[in-house]
Amino acid sequence: MKIVVSGGGTGGHIYPALAFINEMKKRDERLDVLYIGTERGLESEIVPREGIPFQTIHITGFQRKLSMENVKTVVRFLRGTKRAKALLNEFKPDVVIGTGGYVCGPVVYAAAKLKIPTVIHEQNSVPGLTNKFLSRYVDRIAICFKEAEAFFPKNKVVFTGNPRASEVMSGNREEGLRSLGIKPNKKTVLIVGGSRGARPINDAFMSILSDVKAKPYQFVYVTGTVHYERVQEQMKSIGQPENVIVQPFIHNMPDVLSAVDLIVARAGATTLAEITALGLPSILIPSPYVTNNHQEKNAAALSKKDAAILRKESELTGDRLLEDIDDIMVTPGRLDAMKQAAKALGVPTAAEKLHMLVKEVAK
């Protein structure tokens, strides 16, 4: 089978694509894959490193206000579509799947116009502009939140979940504990703001650093690479509590997620797919800087089922964060109830479901 995958810009579009490719490879040793991205997006670093053939097109996203830049974007879209058609005619795929980000716009559109079977995968509860546009042309639309169904033609929608949920199930708890020196006899709270970190989360946690040392549980605090040095300087003056492990970045996240009891994080779609698959309770602080405020809507899908506490960045303080953590960790039965609620929302078989859908469309 030959497939073209396109998606990029952020890890939220790239990692589900890679998880899907890995699932396809497990089931078909002769699978032939071509990944089409942009030369500047994160995918240009990540995808070739995975040993996947990679081609690029030049495209930029639309701005949400009228501007001359949007005129240039239309021209780039038309050129990108022409380039995509050339790549598709040369590779001759059985199916094309787009996982979001503006790069998949011209690729999936070109495939539809060439009568090649097409699927788009929408990770968020509120779709972005690209997937809304493509929904008119594709054969099937895979979604991860039931709330996303309202934005698409009903006859095309299939609920699959996010394939990253399947990958995280392979996490090794013992390796997670060992790699960071986490004490196995203590409950653990993971605080993370994404690969680059989130300053408001860092500031909130640092403001309560002297208070957390008395807590009966331990913390794994991931600052983000950008903020690590600044946090280390602050730690020197305040003093690092024995029950706080500080890291700039975590490379083995599936292992670490398997080893912790509660996570404080942003509400990106991939993060939520991972934590619900594992049944991991969460305090979610959505980024207010994303398109359509989709992280808050993602988080709301969990909080209304009591799988998470949704805490807006505008109302985040260190004291409020510690209250939320204590509420979950100390209240009898609360942690277990949230675990069950999170697990009920998880789709650990998401990669298999997406694989089956793509195979069906490719026939």
From Swiss-Prot:
Keyword Cell cycle listed: yes
One Gene Ontology CC term in the entry: plasma membrane
Keywords recorded for this protein, A-Z: Cell cycle, Cell division, Cell membrane, Cell shape, Cell wall biogenesis/degradation, Glycosyltransferase, Membrane, Peptidoglycan synthesis, Transferase
Record localization: Cell membrane
Main location: membrane
Binding residues for UDP-N-acetyl-alpha-D-glucosamine: 10-12, 124, 195, 250, 295
GO molecular function: UDP-N-acetyl-D-glucosamine:N-acetylmuramoyl-L-alanyl-D-glutamyl-meso-2,6-diaminopimelyl-D-alanyl-D-alanine-diphosphoundecaprenol 4-beta-N-acetylglucosaminlytransferase activity; undecaprenyldiphospho-muramoylpentapeptide beta-N-acetylglucosaminyltransferase activity
Keyword Ribonucleoprotein found: no
NCBIfam families membership: murG (TIGR01133)
Protein's recorded name: UDP-N-acetylglucosamine--N-acetylmuramyl-(pentapeptide) pyrophosphoryl-undecaprenol N-acetylglucosamine transferase
Annotated source species: Halalkalibacterium halodurans (strain ATCC BAA-125 / DSM 18197 / FERM 7344 / JCM 9153 / C-125)
